[in-house]
Amino acid sequence: MSLIRLNIDSFRNIQLAQLSPSEGINLIYGQNGSGKTSILEAIYFLGMGRSFRSHLSQRVINNDQDKLTLFATLNLPRGDSKIGLRRFRSGETEVKIDGEKVKRLSTLAETLPIQVITPESFSLLFEGPKSRRQFIDWGAFHTDPQFYAAWMNVRRVLKQRNQMLRNGSPYDQIQYWDREFIRYTEQVTEIRNRYVDSLNELLKGIIGEFLPQVDVKVSFTRGWDSKTDFAQLLESQYPRDLATGHTVSGPHKADLRLRVGTLPAQDALSRGQLKLLVCALRIAQGKLLKQQIDKHSIYLVDDLPSELDAQHRQLLLKQLVDTGAQVFVTAIEPAAIVDSLHTPPSRMFHVEHGRVTVIE
C-alpha cells in the first residue's frame, strides 16, 4: 500500500500543493518554517482525522480560509482507492472513501495505517503509560477485527461505572455494570497480550541491531495485579473507587514496560539510546502489520538529522528501506539524508514558503 497522489488545500501555510510520491523513500527538504513538516502532518491528518502537533484541529486550517481539504489516491492490492477529508473551522468534518461518506474516523485509520517518528513521538518512553497504551492499541486495532468493538464497549461501561461512583451508588447497583466491564476487559486484555507477544518476537532482532550491547526486556501489564481475579478486585476496591470517584484499576491502566536489568529503560538508557528504542518499536510494529495482515504502514519521519547522528541515521534508514514500506522523511539539507542512504531517494521535494517543487 502506498500514496500515489496527494492534494493539500489550505493546510497551515500550504495554500495548494499536489504531490505524486514514490512507493519508496520520499525526501522532503527545506528551511525551518517552509512547510515540509506540514506535508507529513497533512498525511497524518488524512489518516487519523487529527494532527500529531496540535490537539486543536482548527489551528491547522490556513488563516485566510474557513476549511481545509485533503485528498489522496492509494495504491492497494485490490486497486486504487480515493480518500478525502474536509475540516471546517467550526469543527465539522467530512470524510469520503471512494465517493462514499464515512461517519467514523476509525475507518480512515483502518484504511491508512501510519507510523510517525518525530521529535514528539519520543514521548512514548518519556511520558506516562497513556502513550504506550495507544501504541499497543494501534497494533491491536489494525491486526484484530474484534478489538475496536471490545475497546469501545470498555470505554462505554467504564464511563457509566465512574458516573455511578461519583453519584455514590451502592455496590449492588454497580454490579450489573461490573459484569459487562469484566466481559469486555477480558477480550481487550487477551488481544493486547497476544499482540505484545507477537511484537516481542520481531522486536528482539531489531533492538539487537540498534542497541547491540543492551538487553531490553519488553512486557505487557494489564492494569491490575495479574495474580488477582478482576471480579474480586472490583468488589474489594469499591470503597476506594467510591472515595476517588473513578475506577482505580482496569484495562484503562494497562502499560507496556521496557526494562534493562532491574531498571526501567527510561532510567537505564541515555536519551540517544531511548530514541533508538522508540525507532525499533515503530519499525517492529510496521513489520508485524505486514506479517499479520499483509499491509504496509506509511512512515512519516520528521527532522531526522537533528534527532540521530550520522551512523544511526544510516541504520534507521536501512531498516525503513528493508520494511518495503513507503517513507516520507524531512530534513533541512538533503545531503543529511542522501548521504545516509545506499541508493538515492526515490523522489525528492523542495518546500519553500509553503510551495512544493519536485526535484527531477
Swiss-Prot record:
Keywords: ATP-binding, Cytoplasm, DNA damage, DNA repair, DNA replication, DNA-binding, Nucleotide-binding, SOS response. Transmembrane segments: none annotated. GO terms for biological process: DNA replication; DNA synthesis involved in DNA repair; double-strand break repair; SOS response. InterPro entries: DNA-binding_RecF (IPR001238), DNA-binding_RecF_CS (IPR018078), P-loop_NTPase (IPR027417), RecF/RecN/SMC_N (IPR003395), RecF_2 (IPR042174). One of its GO terms (molecular function) is single-stranded DNA binding. Its main location: cytoplasm. The RecF protein is involved in DNA metabolism; it is required for DNA replication and normal SOS inducibility. RecF binds preferentially to single-stranded, linear DNA. It also seems to bind ATP. Belongs to the RecF family. This is DNA replication and repair protein RecF. The lineage of its organism: Bacteria, Pseudomonadati, Pseudomonadota, Gammaproteobacteria, Alteromonadales.
